[in-house]
Amino acid sequence: MVRIAIAGAAGRMGRNLVKATHQNPLSELGAGSERPESSLVGVDIGELCGIGKQGIVLVDNLEQAVEQFDVIIDFTAPASTLANLALCEQHGKKLVIGTTGFTDAQRQTIEQAAKKIPIVMAPNYSVGVNLVFKLLEKAAKVMGDYCDIEIIEAHHRHKVDAPSGTAIGMGEAIAHAMGNQLSDVAVYAREGITGERSRNEIGFATIRAGDIIGEHTAMFADIGERVEITHKATDRMTFANGAVKAAIWLAEQPAGFYTMIDVLGLNDL
């Protein structure tokens, strides 16, 4: 049984992670944390998340419960995730990262830590999205040289980073399949007189509205035809169940930097 701690357990995603951990027969809830200023610190996590009293209360720092878990699942914010990364390094714990919006320097810090501890980091933990990443690699190799490529993503009004980590992951899959770095070909905004579109660029469009959980489309457009590969999420439990699956898988892995592609065994697809 893998003991899991949920960072940000009182948030929208955190509550789903608590439920997914509780429902999976291979995992159990070990701890949960919230920001120190939260009025929910000290509340029973199970009662908060609707799974019944668990005898585990929210703490404001997972170090207070470090003996109660093997893996942290963190879908919070970059600064909070990096603090939990340091905790995992210090105590030999494992870390599943669903947080997005890291700078290049912060990502390098995570990759460096993975030399000491096992880490799974992915922009999206749904099986469907990770299959889409592989499909995009195939499509890019066939159509990338002659099609215009655009990525459109939509999320709820509360999402704070743009484009989404999943959209960037889609762009990276396409760019790498074509032998490019995304940073060299990405166009994140168009306004005014932009001139003609260059052949190699990958365009991004972002929508923030209502309660959209997550929708992503990659478009390969040629003259006379267009191929679109789309994923639509309708329930956050999709991501939560995938993250718990990753935590259970990670518990048996040596130190290293892994993605959901590794967890699902899709590398050879």
UniProtKB/Swiss-Prot annotation:
The active site is at residues 155, 159. It comes from the Bacteria. It holds the Pfam family DapB_C. GO terms for cellular component: cytosol. Pathway: Amino-acid biosynthesis; L-lysine biosynthesis via DAP pathway; (S)-tetrahydrodipicolinate from L-aspartate: step 4/4. Its EC number is 1.17.1.8. InterPro entries: DapB_C (IPR022663), DapB_N (IPR000846), DapB_N_CS (IPR022664), DHDPR_bac (IPR023940), NAD(P)-bd_dom_sf (IPR036291). It is an enzyme of class 1 (oxidoreductase). NADP(+) binds at residue 35. This is 4-hydroxy-tetrahydrodipicolinate reductase.
